Amino acid sequence: MIPSRISHKFPLFLRSSLAAPKAAYRFSSTIPKPSDQVPDVDAFLNKIGRNCNELKDTFENNWNNLFQWDSKILKEKGVNIQQRKYILKQVHNYRNNRPIHEIKLGKKSFFGGERKRKAFTAKWKAENKQ
């Protein structure tokens, strides 16, 4: 037997679980219109750089594909993880009216990362003294 205090909440639980999935409505109203600077998918991919313009055939030059596809779909299309994350970040920025521009890849230091830099520098100097 179901206690009386839970029984009045049970139909609400059923009603919410049987509702249409939220994923279907996820990006329906958040697809921005193309601007003068970014009129189509090809221009968007050229503007963000990092050789993303090679993927214009993947998006089929369709503005809706660019803003509706998630990481799972891009993975199925064969886009590598670094470009997927980068494109989705730039799409998110454009959707939120933030400026989009190319973010250059970082360059590794000759002496390694920040944590071990002192050790590598000391080792390199010791080798060069001899």
From Swiss-Prot:
In its UniProt record, a GO molecular function of this protein is: structural constituent of ribosome
Disulfide pairs here are none
The compartments listed are: Mitochondrion
Residues of the transit peptide = 1-27
Q: What is its main location?
A: mitochondrion
Quick check: keyword Ribonucleoprotein in the entry? yes
Q: Which Pfam families match?
A: SAM_Ribosomal_mS41
GO annotations of cellular component type: mitochondrial inner membrane; mitochondrial small ribosomal subunit; mitochondrion
Against InterPro entries, the record matches this protein to:
Ribosomal_mS41, SAM_Ribosomal_mS41
Ordered alphabetically, the record's keywords are: Mitochondrion, Ribonucleoprotein, Ribosomal protein, Transit peptide
Q: Which GO terms describe its biological process?
A: mitochondrial translation
What PANTHER family does this protein's entry cite? Answer: PROTEIN FYV4, MITOCHONDRIAL, SMALL RIBOSOMAL SUBUNIT PROTEIN MS41
Protein family per UniProt: Belongs to the mitochondrion-specific ribosomal protein mS41 family.
What is this protein's function per UniProt?
Component of the mitochondrial ribosome (mitoribosome), a dedicated translation machinery responsible for the synthesis of mitochondrial genome-encoded proteins, including at least some of the essential transmembrane subunits of the mitochondrial respiratory chain. The mitoribosomes are attached to the mitochondrial inner membrane and translation products are cotranslationally integrated into the membrane. mS41 is involved in telomere length regulation and required for survival upon exposure to K1 killer toxin.
- Assembly and partners? Component of the mitochondrial small ribosomal subunit (mt-SSU). Mature yeast 74S mitochondrial ribosomes consist of a small (37S) and a large (54S) subunit. The 37S small subunit contains a 15S ribosomal RNA (15S mt-rRNA) and 34 different proteins. The 54S large subunit contains a 21S rRNA (21S mt-rRNA) and 46 different proteins.
Any extra detail in the entry?
A: Present with 2630 molecules/cell in log phase SD medium.
Please give the name of this protein: Small ribosomal subunit protein mS41
Lineage, please? Eukaryota, Fungi, Dikarya, Ascomycota, Saccharomycotina
Q: Which gene encodes it?
A: FYV4
